[in-house]
Curated annotation (Swiss-Prot):
One of its GO terms (molecular function) is ATP hydrolysis activity. The chain crosses the membrane at residues 271-291, 526-546, 583-603, 607-627. InterPro entries: AAA+_ATPase, ABC3_permease_C, ABC_transporter-like_ATP-bd, ABC_transporter-like_CS, MacB-like_ATP-bd, MacB_PCD, Macrolide_Exporter_MacB, P-loop_NTPase. The gene is macB. This is Macrolide export ATP-binding/permease protein MacB.
Length: 644
């Protein structure tokens, strides 16, 4: 049974509205171990015939059998298996990858055969040594002469065994001495049992072969044998197997290595591609950190006031007394509210602004007249002295507890305890200093305050008994809504109408949290758009990369790369560059966040956000890299090789 059998092979190419046929019914049989030359002038169809023989192209009509197996019925992976395991190509233009060393070019077919890196490196170096290139192992093609490059090409053809060597004008770009050396090497391979097929226009080159087939205008016109016997060591061949669609882990790692090499070779383009992803990921990290910081800041301030609180205020539409206070709430209402189930404390409050004077200094500050339960309600205790008690309220004691700001302004050097200050010319004795609170959620200084007993304030400072608010603490927060309804009902009954409004701090916290979550989502969406734009940039750059590397893709396909290998390689490059951008983006986002923290902005980083941002960056590389990678994988090997 012939190793190669062509029956009525025709090949047509589209030319406008018509097809041009370049091979006209070729019939050819080649036995294993033959040294055959296919000779013809330029345009005779000999290169097209070689492409069909080497499974780089498919015939338009006819039947091609390899080792009895119908090649025309094989799928892409089986054709790649034949190119990888059976054929070895020696091209006139060498077709070496410019960014790879000599041994790496030779080892290329073994990558797609799944040979471990060290094993293929040793074999590649041994092949080059056998061909006299032991001192050129690390040289790139640009550092080699034409003859040396052709020997690298021969070594590559032998990397996986090269049972069939297809040499297309192997001496065409060489001087006579180098050309003769190459033909001697091909003769030696034939003597070792390889099937050698040389494509040439030169009769002197064809004379080295045992059999010469001449082609003219797409027709075989002669078939001459110089020797009638085959070499005794002709190598047996097998049919291509069905291959697994699952990639080998070694293939993935090799794809990563090749991706890093390719990205390093075009570092400026890689940097520009990274920039879009870096900006997108960094923006996501910073924006969400700002949003989360703002949310937690507001929530913390609400929590400081207590989420178990109900604040009862007069309805703004109610009647006002002469000084503008709404005449609705009175201290007795607070006592009534304390009688309700689930209410532990009810603190009445009157507040206003006064001029405070002490030690010859005047300041404008706020004053709060409250009951003795105020520190417990607000979880705000004195750090010096004491807070007034029930007896002080009963006796209308002229005592005061001051905030830290008032202390610093009126008593900058001395101990304020026991000293007097005037509030609108009314003397009060300082009995305590509250702990520092800082600014409120509205930016107000909570330490710029003087706190006095409610009874004293109503009598001596405000001259009226109507309250600004009553703050209620509930025992069971899960029942806070029911307690709120009960409070409104009680006060409506007492006043004969509904003239109050109740502010639920738990509901306020929930509302603020939802608002902040919406704001954070908005900020994240804006940042995600930047990441999306970065992904489009990745796709554009990868499309450019595919266009620039069509020739390299052709070389890889000729040496046995499957479509999935090409797809995997370009997808890996896209994912690697996006993942690198994701890592750098996270780092830069954290650095920018820390910088903003130095300026007092509330920033809260989230590790899950960083992880998700990185994963999204890699996912964007996968998503936007798929179209360019698919384009590369679907290239025709012959067309890709001719794109130089």
């Amino acid at each position: 049974m012939p190793l190669i059998e062509l029956c009525n092979i025709r090949k047509r190419y589209p030319a406008g509205d018509q097809d041009v046929e370049v091979l006209h019914g070729i019939d050819l049989s080649i036995e294993a171990g033959e040294f055959l030359a296919i000779m013809g002038s330029s345009g005779s169809g000999k290169s097209t015939l070689m492409h069909i023989l080497g499974c780089l192209d498919q015939p338009s009509d006819g039947e091609y059998r390899f080792s009895g197996q119908p090649v025309t019925a094989m799928d892409h992976d089986q054709l790649a298996w034949l190119r990888r395991e059976m054929f070895g190509f020696v091209f006139q233009s060498y077709h070496l990858i410019g960014t790879a060393s000599a041994w790496e070019n030779v080892a290329l077919p073994a990558i797609y055969a799944g040979v471990p890196r060290e094993e293929r490196k040793q074999r590649a170096q041994q092949l080059l040594t056998d061909l006299g290139l032991e001192d050129r192992l690390e040289n790139r093609p640009s550092q080699l002469s034409g003859g040396q490059q052709q020997r690298v090409s021969i070594a590559r053809a032998l990397m996986n065994g090269g049972k069939v060597i297809l040499a297309d004008e192997p001496t065409g770009a060489l001087d006579s001495a180098s050309g003769e050396a190459v033909m001697d090497q091909l003769r030696s391979l034939a003597e070792q049992g390889h099937t050698v097929i040389v494509i040439t226009h030169d009769a002197k080159v064809a004379a080295h072969a045992d059999r010469v087939v001449e082609i003219h205008d797409g027709n075989l016109i002669s078939d001459t044998r110089h020797h009638d016997h085959l070499h005794e060591r002709a190598k047996p061949v097998s049919a291509p197997p069905k291959e697994s669609v699952m990639p080998d882990p070694g293939e993935v790692m090799e794809a990563v290595v090749m991706a890093l090499r390719s990205l390093r070779a075009n570092w400026m383009r890689t940097l520009l591609t990274l920039l879009g992803i870096v900006i997108g990921v960094g923006a996501v990290v910073v924006m969400l950190a700002i949003g989360e910081g703002a949310k937690q800041d507001v929530v913390a301030q609400i929590n400081e006031r207590g989420t178990n609180l109900l604040v009862v205020r007069p309805d703004r539409g109610m009647q006002r007394v002469a000084d503008g206070v709404i005449a609705t709430l009175v201290p007795a209402d607070a006592q009534a509210l304390e009688s309700l189930p689930n209410i532990s404390i009810a603190v009445p409050e009157i507040s206003g602004n006064v001029t405070a004077r002490a030690n010859g200094m005047d300041i404008s500050t706020s004053v709060q007249a409250v009951s003795e339960d105020f520190p417990s309600l607000r979880d705000w205790q004195p750090v010096q002295g004491i807070f007034f008690g029930e007896e002080d309220l009963k006796s209308y004691s002229p005592v005061a507890v001051i905030g830290q700001t008032v202390k610093e302004n009126l008593f900058p050097e001395g101990d304020p305890l026991g000293q007097f200050l005037l509030l609108d010319s009314i003397p009060f004795q300082v009995i305590g200093v509250m702990s520092a609170q800082g600014a409120s959620d509205r930016g107000e200084d909570q330490d710029d305050v003087v706190i006095v007993p409610l009874s004293t304030g109503t009598l001596r400072l405000f001259g009226q008994n109507y309250l600004n608010s009553i703050t209620v603490a509930v025992d069971d927060v899960t029942q806070i809504d029911a307690t709120e309804a009960a409070a409104v009902a009680l006060l409506t009954q007492r006043h004969g109408k509904q003239d109050v409004r109740v502010f639920n701090m738990a509901s306020l916290l929930e509302m603020v949290s939802e608002t902040q979550n919406t704001l954070t989502a908005l900020l994240g969406s804006i940042a995600a758009i930047s990441l999306l734009v970065g992904g489009i940039g990745v796709m554009n750059i990868m499309l450019v990369s595919v266009t620039e590397r069509i020739h390299e893709i052709g070389i890889r396909m000729a040496t046995g790369a499957r479509q999935r290998n090409i797809l995997q390689q370009f997808l890996t490059e896209s994912v690697v560059v996006s993942a690198l951008g994701g890592i750098v983006g996270v780092v830069i986002g954290v650095l920018v966040g820390w910088l903003l923290m130095l300026f007092g902005m509330a920033i809260v980083f989230s590790v899950p956000v960083m992880v998700v941002s990185f994963v999204c960056a890699a996912g964007i590389g996968l998503l936007f890299g798929f179209a360019p990678a698919l384009k590369a994988a679907r290239l025709n090997p012959v067309e890709a090789l001719s794109n130089d």
